[in-house]
């Protein structure tokens, strides 16, 4: 019989699944009906920083499976608007306009503009992460590339009092990215909610009030 030593990759995968299933935030998210544990991270940031109000317009980049949009839609209410966009399919959510598109393309941007119907954007959200290979030399640049795409989108669509919340990872490129946000926004805050795994390099940057 093959042992874990002989099949390290498979055993590592099993260990990750086991940690995921035993995670109290995963269990809580399921019990509360959220599509992903990421909703609990956003809820914690909202409770601390007061992001969402009725009537706001929010764009959720890389939205699938929809945990963030699911949380935000009732907060902004019927007077608000949530536009979710992803290359992956996403099951419909009440109060959410889903675009199956790539926001980094001209076609995707035009789709967002049509969905907004001329309304200014109050908040841009990005919980995107690349498909991880396990090799930091590959994964970190890919993650920072997604964050930079999201920042460019926010710079194009946010109004002057808007907020940009983006997931990034400590490592190469992080300091430069944060420095760029500091030049482009009035304030940049770091947030690591309890629902983020303690050993993860994941952190959320909340950039408030575009200045350029």
UniProtKB/Swiss-Prot annotation:
GO CC, sorted alphabetically, is:
cytoplasm
Which residues lie within the region annotated Disordered? 1-24
Q: Where in the cell is it found?
A: Cytoplasm
- One Pfam family of this chain: FtsJ
User: In the Enzyme Commission scheme, what number(s) does this protein have?
Assistant: 2.1.1.166
**Biased segments, Basic residues type:** 1-10
Give this protein's Gene Ontology molecular function annotations: rRNA (uridine-2'-O-)-methyltransferase activity
Which residues are named in the active-site annotation?
167 (proton acceptor)
Cited function: Specifically methylates the uridine in position 2552 of 23S rRNA at the 2'-O position of the ribose in the fully assembled 50S ribosomal subunit.
According to UniProt, the name of this protein is: Ribosomal RNA large subunit methyltransferase E
Q: Which organism is it from?
A: Halorhodospira halophila (strain DSM 244 / SL1) (Ectothiorhodospira halophila (strain DSM 244 / SL1))
Instruction: Kindly list the organism's lineage.
Output: Bacteria, Pseudomonadati, Pseudomonadota, Gammaproteobacteria, Chromatiales
